Amino acid sequence: MGLRDGVRARNESAWLLPNDGTRTNHRLRRDMRRFADEDEIDLVIVGCGAGGSVLLQRLTRAGWRVAALDAGPFWDPDTDWVSDEAGSHHLYWTDPRLIAGSDPVPMGSNNSGRGVGGSMVHYAGYTPRFHPSDFTTRTVDGVGADWPVSYPQLRPYYEQLEQELPVAGERWPWGDPHGYPHRPHPVGGNGEVFLRGAAKLGITAKVGPVAIANGRFGNRPHCIYRGFCLQGCKVNAKASPLITHVPDALAHGAEVRADAMVTRIAVDERTGRATGVHYVANGRERFQRAQMVAVAGYSIETPRLLLNSASSRFPGGLCNDFDQVGRYLMVQGAPQTAGRFDAEVRMYKAPPPEVSTEAFYETDPGRDYKRGFSIQTVSPLPITWAEHVAAQGHWGPALREYMRDYVHWSCLGALCEFLPRPENRVTLADEKDSYGLPVACFSYSQCDNDRALTRAAQTVMEDILHAAGADEVITIQRYAHLVGGARMAADERHGVVDRHCRSFAVPNLYVTDGSVLPTQGSANPALTIMAVAARAAHYLTAGAAGGIS
């Protein structure tokens, strides 16, 4: 079987042609299988984002009866997404959450999605792999945590998903050097600035990798470089589970139950096994029976659900006998530095992360910090650009001048690997949401290593922009990309799930989202979350074939 035939066999969704004249296959949604609550299905998945959708697709293809419940809507790109920053806030999880700590993390568009497709609906499309060193930071660098899985064990799933999305980019020289199935996209003005400045400083930079079609891919068109990747990608050139793995799962018999808020996981007090999930849909409380449960609500909602599922058998919260649920939550430091140029740059005219470098990713004994950071182009649209400028104290006439000058600015962003710490965690607050459930409280504080990384990344970005010819630079401090909160570990005293994402406490409960990642890395986490879920699905299907309950 050739490579293309193999991809076709694994994920036919890329070749499903629209059958009603729209980019969304409405027939698949209309005619999808629907289970009754009283049906004891094989698996119910909570959340249908990066991890939940891959698990759904893999297991449905293996013949399992699976339903995924998502708290948000089933998006239709034709009607729900617009080329408008202000008109896209409905894509984000904006329910109440509390933040605390010495360096609190604002919640919203940069780290929370709501709806089928999850946060990948509004991510920038950047899909790098983690490095081999990310899996052994405790052993090699003396910080962070070692994963109970290795990079070689995850590599086959990276390769599968890079074909399925697909990913476009130049050959990647860092970490485990590798190529990508699609050629890199043309470089826009922002990327040209980065490449020019990096070359003058002797810093290697490359184009990609992005999960954005470069050329037609099935029923998905070529990217038109419109700049609205973070608003859903109305043309469907950018891959997300909504247009890749979810349609394929529906075509093979899955059910996706949108606008279904799961409130609690039920556990048999006698056997200690999960029996299904309580959820609310259309204002009614319901219960879906299942032989197995997988949680994929991401790093805030997954710990919150586990803690809200306390019972007499698990009084401190489900899977929380050793006080691990909610701990070791991580973000990446994500400062952004912009530079002004006499010539027009028009940074929005390309995929936002078009050029990047991982030259500073690994620990360097000559630096005063452990681990590292990556740098990539970012392309704030006008409203976000106004926020950048206002953060510098500019207002009124000065702000208007910066806005008029928008097309002359280039912007770079760093992703700094902040370290996992047990005190950075999700707990339950006294406040309740509209369902009567305690809301999540996320407490976060940086350590000295985190701050040193951020300073170093800012300096490198400023140097690159000055080397490229910028006559002014400005920097804002940000966070990006939640992971952790239900991490995988070698034993239950140090984590919530094992190397296969199976919980230590409840034998038929899995967690398959970013909350299981033990470390953050300096790479965007979407592809790694999908790869971890694909590996868990492989384990489940192999175990079922071998008679393992």
PLM features per residue range, with description:
Residues 519-538:
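A conserved FAD-binding loop/helix module that cradles the flavin
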Residues 58-61, 65, 72-77, 81, ...:
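Glycine-rich loop(s) and the adjacent beta-strand/alpha-helix scaffold that form part
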Residues 104-110, 147-151, 320-440, 494, ...:
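FAD cofactor-binding and catalytic pocket of flavoenzymes
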Residues 2-43, 61-62, 542-549:
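Extreme N-terminal leader/targeting segments of oxidoreductases
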Residues 12-20, 139-262, 482, 487:
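Conserved redox-cofactor binding core of oxidoreductases
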Residues 43-68:
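N-terminal Rossmann-like FAD-binding beta1-loop-alpha1 element of flavoenzymes
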Residues 15-16, 40, 207-211, 217-229, ...:
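A glycine-rich dinucleotide-binding beta-alpha-beta segment and adjacent secondary-structure elements
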Residues 87-174, 363-364, 422:
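Redox-cofactor-proximal catalytic regions of oxidoreductases
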